Amino acid sequence: MRCVVYSIAKNSPLELVKSYQKQCKRFDCELELVDLFPKNTANAQKVSKELAQKSYSLAFEPYLSPKAKNIALHPEAQRGDSFAFSKMLENHLNINFFIAGAYGFEEKFLKDCQAWSLSEMTFSHEVAKIVLCEQIYRALSIIFKHPYHK
């Protein structure tokens, strides 16, 4: 299995995320984080919400794959507990997660993905990545009946 977390951000590798990457390998899952922040995104965010959202879509579109489950993290999307999250990931070999910038996703991009919300609360990118990585590891623990999730 391969899970890739794409986000509009300048830098990532947090120590806690690295530990979840290592733990996911126990379940033969490569957990990768890719930060994207094209030059046009910085400029677009200064101009308007719509241009910012469009720049996020343009940055992410090359990574949308018909051979993968594509999941956009969106605060107004469906949410569920860790068991529901594990069901969503189960039986998929390649999963792409997308975390937009401050202005969120264009509706058009959301239609190309399954949208999922981590919480009703708003998180910084760093916290969202940590929560997402922990939930991926927890989902794998549930799928493989490892005692971590209890």
Swiss-Prot record:
GO terms for cellular component: cytoplasm. Its EC number is 2.1.1.177. One of its GO terms (molecular function) is rRNA (pseudouridine-N3-)-methyltransferase activity. S-adenosyl-L-methionine binds at residues 100, 118-123. It is found in: Cytoplasm. Specifically methylates the pseudouridine at position 1915 (m3Psi1915) in 23S rRNA. NCBIfam families: PRK00103.2-1. This is Ribosomal RNA large subunit methyltransferase H.
